[in-house]
Amino acid sequence: MQKCIMRSTEFKTHFSFHSIFSFPLSAALLALISASEPASKAFINVQFISSPLVKKEVLPFIVSFHSLSSNGILSFSPFTSSNLSIAQLPFLIKVPLLSMGSLALENFNKFIPRADLVAAWVTIIMVFTFGNFLSTLSIKTGQNLWHLSKISSSVSPLLLGIILGSQSGEIMLGKNLLITS
């Protein structure tokens, strides 16, 4: 059984983040969370303790979110500090609904049904669109609506849980991860 260990990181908002989703799902969800504090920058350092597939070497994967403007529009860019080339690394991510901050990456040899991935993307797009709508409305009206945006970003993982949740109270995300150096 393969596992992923992620070093816990703190946002400048003092929000302790202990979970990671499949990329780019991770980028979308983390951007939503980061958008609740548009002036902040979040740096997430993820280390995959690799399987025999990558010869037990450690693959650091750093995702940084840079605040572009005060309305919370963010961009992200991935950086890999390894010369490894991994083709179609399948993985199964289980996120306990009662503990959204924890994650175990297990069972590299399992795939997630495409329907689950589509449902996850639909949810993310809906919440992300709502966040952008709040940003635009805040600029036009001059009112601070970031508390609503923060609520929407907090609800995003819960919506994913409701849509993708299994009877065991866990959601499964991800399909294939392609990283090339």
Swiss-Prot record:
Q: Which residues lie on this side of the membrane: Cytoplasmic?
A: 1-14, 80-84, 138-153
Keywords on record: Membrane, Transmembrane, Transmembrane helix
Q: What is its main location?
A: membrane
Q: How does it sit in the membrane?
A: Multi-pass membrane protein
Cysteine pairs forming cystine bridges in this chain are none
Extracellular compartment spans: 36-58, 106-116, 175-181
Which is one Gene Ontology cellular component term of this protein?
A: membrane
Segments spanning the bilayer are 15-35, 59-79, 85-105, 117-137, 154-174
Give the UniProt subcellular location, in the record's own words.
Answer: Membrane
Note on file? Answer: Partially overlaps YNL108c.
Official protein name in the record = Putative uncharacterized membrane protein YNL109W
